[in-house]
């Protein structure tokens, strides 16, 4: 969901009592691509989603694998208070959009950013020193290890 509430820089909320919604990577339905390109992209996405689910088996708190919906408040009604999403973008775009500063080893290279968002208020919860990663698996592993 492209709409955000306030940006809150603080420690990540305690997720021990809450169910975390883990958003799957999106498949493409881009009509400008050939059928072969769409199938290849979607197969790659299926593999990413499988690996995402496997890696989350190491997460110690409650979570539910979900697909992204337009209105995130739907998840709130299902008992999911926070959403975990991995975003792929350029550092400058995320900094501009969220009005934050991000650490990244290679600032000109697009990377992966973990977005933790409250499902009802749409507030974005940020670490004191947000960071981007070159590999989505590293972003996910950092989240699992530190939350």
Q: What would you call each of these model-derived segments?
A:
Residues 1-147:
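Short beta-strand and adjacent turn/loop elements
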């Amino acid at each position: 969901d492209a709409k955000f509430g306030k940006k809150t820089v603080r420690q990540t909320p305690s997720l021990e009592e809450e169910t975390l919604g883990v958003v799957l990577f999106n498949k493409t339905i881009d009509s400008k691509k050939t059928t072969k390109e769409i199938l290849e992209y979607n197969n790659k996405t299926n593999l990413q989603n499988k690996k995402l689910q496997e890696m989350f088996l190491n997460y110690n708190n409650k979570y539910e694998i979900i697909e992204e919906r337009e209105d995130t408040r739907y998840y709130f009604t299902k008992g999911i208070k926070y959403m975990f999403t991995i975003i792929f973008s350029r550092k400058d775009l995320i900094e501009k959009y969220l009005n934050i500063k991000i650490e990244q080893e290679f600032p000109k290279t697009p990377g992966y950013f973990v977005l933790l968002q409250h499902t009802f208020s749409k507030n974005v919860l940020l670490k004191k020193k947000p960071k981007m990663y070159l590999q989505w698996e590293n972003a996910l592993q950092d989240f699992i290890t530190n939350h």
